[in-house]
Amino acid sequence: MAQLLNSILSVIDVFHKYAKGNGDCALLCKEELKQLLLAEFGDILQRPNDPETVETILNLLDQDRDGHIDFHEYLLLVFQLVQACYHKLDNKSHGGRTSQQERGQEGAQDCKFPGNTGRQHRQRHEEERQNSHHSQPERQDGDSHHGQPERQDRDSHHGQSEKQDRDSHHSQPERQDRDSHHNQSERQDKDFSFDQSERQSQDSSSGKKVSHKSTSGQAKWQGHIFALNRCEKPIQDSHYGQSERHTQQSETLGQASHFNQTNQQKSGSYCGQSERLGQELGCGQTDRQGQSSHYGQTDRQDQSYHYGQTDRQGQSSHYSQTDRQGQSSHYSQPDRQGQSSHYGQMDRKGQCYHYDQTNRQGQGSHYSQPNRQGQSSHYGQPDTQDQSSHYGQTDRQDQSSHYGQTERQGQSSHYSQMDRQGQGSHYGQTDRQGQSSHYGQPDRQGQNSHYGQTDRQGQSSHYGQTDRQGQSSHYSQPDKQGQSSHYGKIDRQDQSYHYGQPDGQGQSSHYGQTDRQGQSFHYGQPDRQGQSSHYSQMDRQGQSSHYGQTDRQGQSSHYGQTDRQGQSYHYGQTDRQGQSSHYIQSQTGEIQGQNKYFQGTEGTRKASYVEQSGRSGRLSQQTPGQEGYQNQGQGFQSRDSQQNGHQVWEPEEDSQHHQHKLLAQIQQERPLCHKGRDWQSCSSEQGHRQAQTRQSHGEGLSHWAEEEQGHQTWDRHSHESQEGPCGTQDRRTHKDEQNHQRRDRQTHEHEQSHQRRDRQTHEDKQNRQRRDRQTHEDEQNHQR
């Protein structure tokens, strides 16, 4: 028999000789591997009797981490040794002459993976290559980017193609673990676009020279174990920013990608890249552990969804992305700590954007942008702590939005935006910890939703958003601590919204929402403990509101809201620490002309009620020039500790300075504030009955009782503090409020018409998405 075939059979016989010791001829255990190394390679091992030597070699070879070495893993050892010996002998035989190809081998060897060259070696291992799991027949430029002219270098450019772990962009045929076009994922979180990868030294079996260009993570054999290579340096060379987690690359943690590489803490992106450990993305990719996606992707554990996604545990979505800490999206890519995106890019602390970008931590928005921890979105994406959204983006503390962006402390907004912590939104989103959503997405524990989303600690909403401490709103703006908004949603911990969906524990709903503990709503949202209501919402302790929302610490609402301790309002908003309202925000600044109906006499202005939750004395802001009507007749609230009429309100925003002046003026004329439980004087019983009839749950009854008690308390205090002018003003204001309510009802009917038009617009957008999806499928077919 030929010498080469005898050598091949000898390699196989040695494996079976030691593998059959425990009865399993297919695997080598640790003890059997030790015997094989001592007997066969003892002369060249640096420390043959050192237990760490066996442990190190076992860890390098054991790719499936089962504690045993199978035949193809055993072949890796043989290949490594053959390559090292060949390299040494070749250098000696040629003296000082070294071809460029050999220098490429040296560079690859410095990267802890000796190069494999020469037709002789391919012939020698032709049969082993057939048996090798991680090797495969060579393609002529098949796995190379734009094709490499050199036969042996083509797979070394930007990553090696291998049989198991390479994901190919533009669909390369692969045997195991190939993911789809524009959406690849890999066994151990490796996403590749325009790029191939291998796990340790797979291409060596197929006779491919791994040049210095490849950094797919080779195990450092020489210089670490075998004495004949102790002079070699463990230098990792990376091309186009290949990700390498540590100096040793074990490919499961360091993926190479073409035009798409990232490092653990440096995100490089071309058309958007992201990944904590080096996951690459092509035109829309993945998240923390390498989930890739096209027009909607996945996240940490690869949960996929269509048109509406979720995040923390790896929900991917089509036309909608999210992930736990690195949401990628089409035309928008993030990465774990550096969010990038196409048509809007950003990174962790230097976010750049195209078509509108904003703020400190890089919230971009237009065709979707991510945020601090890399949330990007196309047609709306969220993530666990930073949700971005299309036509309106946001991030953790910097809400951005399309047609109106904002940043952390400089909030801009289209059609009027505001807020201390930067809530901006137009058709848009915002929240403190990243509430995104437009046609949007789910939340932390993977609640997915269709056309409307929420997230774990970030509320998303369609046509108006809010968040815990920074609520944004459309055609209506909130105040310092996040009063939202129009058509808009709010809640502290996971309220989802219009055309939208679930929350922290995965409550989903269509055209209706829920919050963290599963509150669902229709055209109206609840708050922390999940009070749901139809055309009427309530908050933590059962406050209902009509067309409005509330939340635990920032009750906002459209068409009437309530706040934490059960103050309900119709056509108005409030929140715990800063009540805002749509079509007129409640604040002392009503005297500034926000309320068209309080623009009359000075006496009426003085009698206008200050809306505040009383919890911490924070007054709600109102954006000047907002349209709408104010129906809150909230009286002054004071906590038990606030018994002095000349109480001092600490300004929290410069924008409230004028409000405090007005408040002081009102308080001087009204020395006594009502004692009580933070009851806000509410609108007339007629308004309450209207709100009550539209509540969908029984909490409305208890809430009504509380409100009646609030009226009694207020009346009692009014009699106790019989101040003639003050009582007269109160009664006059009460009548004015009844008139306001009638006008508000008319406005409500107009808003219903707007909603119908919005639904029609929504259906048109759905049709556009279907066309986009069809176009995308056509592109996929064309690329195939």
Swiss-Prot record:
Biased segments, Polar residues type:
286-296, 304-343, 356-392, 400-486, 504-584, 610-646, 680-695
Q: Tell me how the protein is altered or processed after translation.
A: Potential substrate of transglutaminase. Some arginines are probably converted to citrullines by peptidylarginine deimidase.
Report residues binding Ca(2+) 1.
32
Tell me if Metal-binding is a UniProt keyword of this record. Answer: yes
Sites binding Ca(2+) 2 sit at: 62, 64, 66, 68, 73
Biased composition, class Basic and acidic residues, residue ranges: 124-201, 704-722, 729-784
InterPro entries per record: EF-hand-dom_pair, EF_Hand_1_Ca_BS, EF_hand_dom, S-100_dom, S100/CaBP7/8-like_CS, S100_Ca-bd_sub
Entry's Gene Ontology cellular component terms: cornified envelope; cytosol; extracellular region
Compartments, as annotated in UniProt: Secreted, Extracellular space, Extracellular matrix
Task: Tell me any Pfam family this protein matches.
Answer: S_100
Q: Any coiled-coil ranges, and where?
A: none
Annotated GO MF terms:
calcium ion binding; transition metal ion binding
Annotated region (Disordered), positions in chain = 92-221, 282-584, 601-661, 677-784
Keywords, alphabetical: Calcium, Extracellular matrix, Metal-binding, Repeat, Secreted
Q: Which CDD domains match?
A: S-100 (cd00213)
Tissue/organ expression: Expression is scattered in the normal epidermis but strong in the acrosyringium, the inner hair root sheath and in the filiform papilli of the tongue.
Ranges where the EF-hand domain occurs: 13-48, 49-84
User: Which parts of the sequence are annotated with region: S-100-like?
Assistant: 1-91
Which function does this protein serve?
Involved in the cornified cell envelope formation. Multifunctional epidermal matrix protein. Reversibly binds calcium.
Instruction: Give the domain note.
Output: Can be divided into a N-terminal domain with significant homology to S100-like calcium-binding proteins, a central domain containing a series of short tandem repeats, and two flanking segments with low homology to the consensus sequences of the central repeats.
Family the UniProt entry places it in: Belongs to the S100-fused protein family.
Q: Know the name of this protein? A: Repetin
The organism encoding this protein is Homo sapiens (Human)
